Each structure stands twice: as C-alpha cells, then as structure tokens.
Amino acid sequence: MAVISMKQLLEAGVHFGHQTRRWNPKMAKYIFTERNGIHVIDLQQTVKYADQAYDFMRDAAANDAVVLFVGTKKQAADAVAEEAVRSGQYFINHRWLGGTLTNWGTIQKRIARLKEIKRMEEDGTFEVLPKKEVALLNKQRARLEKFLGGIEDMPRIPDVMYVVDPHKEQIAVKEAKKLGIPVVAMVDTNTDPDDIDVIIPANDDAIRAVKLITAKLADAIIEGRQGDDAVAVEAEFAASETQADSIEEIVEVVEGDNA
C-alpha cells in the first residue's frame, strides 16, 4: 500500500505546479499536463517517489542517521520545525546561513555562545548585570535562536538533508552536495532536479502539501527508529469510494479546481 494516497495528494493540492512560463524543462517527465497556464504534476509519479523517499528515510533512520529538515519560506517554516521535533531530528526554518555545513566549526562556536547566554540566565548572572547589558544579551540570544535554535543540539553534520523547495534553498543543497550528504526534497516544476538524490515531485508552495509530505517523512524516521508500531496506520490510506486513482480522475479534479 502506498504511504500517501492519491486522494490525500489531491486534497492537499500537491498536483499544482508553477505557471508554465516559469518551468524548468528538466521537470518535464514529472508533469502530466497543463491547465490554464499551470503545469499539473503527475501524481502517479508522486505516489511512487514518495514511497521511495519514505523507504530511504526509514532505512537511514534505522541506521541512526542524523536528519536535517530545511525549509525557510513561510509556507514551510512551521511544518519543518514541528515534524523535525516530532521525529527527534533537527531543522532550519529561517534564513540559511552560508557555511552552516561547510563551515561547521564556526557555526558550533555560535551555538556555544547561544548555550552560554542561556546558562547565564539560568545561573543568575543576569541578575547582577546592568539592565542594558542584559537587554543586549537577550537580543543576541533571540537572533541566535532564530537561526540556530533548530540545530542547537545537533551532534554532528547531518547524514541526510530533507529540503522543501531546493530552488529557494540552493545554497543549502550546494553545501550538502559538496560534503556528500544525500538530499531528499519536494521538487516543484520550476526546479532543477539534478542535484537532488531522492525526488518527490510536488507543489512546494501550498502549506497543506508541505505538511503532508513533511509529516510522512517524519513518520518514516519514527518507524526507522522505533519500528512499525510507532507509526499509526491512518484509515485514509485504504481505498475509499472517493479516492481518485487514475490520471483521468486527476484531470477532472484539476479542471474543476481551475474552472
């Protein structure tokens, strides 16, 4: 049984790509058709590739992989943080700082500074410092937490990186590739898929679509770490009377949505 059903993908709007004029021709094989100037992603392929991504992430987690979730645009930020935390992993959901991976030593120094400021508050140091200095420290902590809080406890450079919108996160992808870190990503019709190791053709601009795919990969990590019983089997995964499971039905839904 597929880990994500066609019905779930349709309801989340995973099939909607970008305007045809903004497409990347390398994504042609993942596109089913065009409707009203919008490319429609072939969801039968999305189902297949989502299965492959799930298996990849589950197997990596079973081998104690450290996974970094990356998604800095507003549609992805909440899901990336929530699902990374739920699966016991790490995330960056604000601006990617250049060198986060390739200059890991420097990043660790900034993380150490963040932890130092937190300790200063906890051990009472703030109480004996001038208010102005405390205000500056709090400002520094807030900034460090914003950009590095999601990787504060990451023990090492990640073994796998999951990315929402690699077109936007090009620097992150390049750093991962330079270090030989495999990249799993939601890839929309405007993206070059060549640098992605495990592709999930999908709309990466809709909050529901991002949540659906990201949550499923978090499930894969949990299963890899804890076994099948750790992941609840949702009733939606079973065939239903309303499930669309043919290309023709997808087109009908798309035409209806764009009417």
Curated annotation (Swiss-Prot):
GO CC term (a single one): cytosolic small ribosomal subunit
Keywords: Ribonucleoprotein, Ribosomal protein
Entry-linked Pfam families: Ribosomal_S2 (PF00318)
Presence of the UniProt keyword Cell division in the record: no
GO MF term set: structural constituent of ribosome
Record Gene3D superfamilies: Glucose-6-phosphate isomerase like protein, domain 1, Helix hairpin bin
Family the entry assigns: Belongs to the universal ribosomal protein uS2 family.
Domain of life: Bacteria
PROSITE patterns for the chain: RIBOSOMAL_S2_1 (PS00962)
Coiled-coil region(s): none
PANTHER family: 30S RIBOSOMAL PROTEIN S2 PROKARYOTIC AND ORGANELLAR (PTHR12534), SMALL RIBOSOMAL SUBUNIT PROTEIN US2M (PTHR12534:SF0)
Gene Ontology biological process: translation
Name listed for the protein in its UniProt record: Small ribosomal subunit protein uS2
NCBIfam families the UniProt entry points to: rpsB_bact
